[in-house]
Amino acid sequence: MKITVCMATYNGSRFIKIQIQSILSQLGKKDQLVIVDDCSVDNTVEIIENFKDSRIILIRNTSNIGAVAAFSKSLKAANGDIILLSDQDDEWLDNKVSFVRNFFTINNVDLIVHDAKITQNGNLVSHSLFTEIGSSNGLLKNIYSNSFTGCCMAFKRNILKNVLPIPIKSGIFHDAWIGIISKLYRFKVIFIATPLIIHNRHEDNLSTMKRRSIFKIIPDRINLILALFHRVFNGK
């Protein structure tokens, strides 16, 4: 069972080395780490290239396309049987890949979402991301408020035939899209209350977690629902 890890990077030099080390130490010789760099202006690319590891496939964008499009590009390059998504600034616990590989081997499941420990500026603040965000497997719940956290997701490659291409529209995020599409097409989705990564919150990403205005949320949800409708009924 071949594993592909998909990652999008942008100015991630502060944390990227630790994250890549935590991933590569768990991958087999035939596994791969696909990284799409979205025109970083720091030394992120240099850090990645310094690993000199044949399992790393680095794709450098010539123009900035945004995180969703970058992740979509990494998924198109993935050839593993199981695909794991990764942020650039977390750290994987040392049993993550073996846990995921074994879980897919012995269970009839298409997509899993596992739990995470949370640190903020290096200090442990929570033992459960699930508890923090109120994670749930329900379809309508996730359309309203997303529980599909990309850095905690792994899924079978066959899901991609329904997932790709991911619409590049306001309010549509790659992880929510993958999870909700999987539910709509009746793939088996399981949430597992086992933390397998350390999810790192810091000043560079805390701003993206602020509560948004209802005047922003409503049009974003409409965009998502319309995109889901077009995919399911028109195949677009």
Regions found by a protein language model. Name each.
Residues 61-78:
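Glycine-rich, basic loop-to-helix element that forms the pyrophosphate-binding segment
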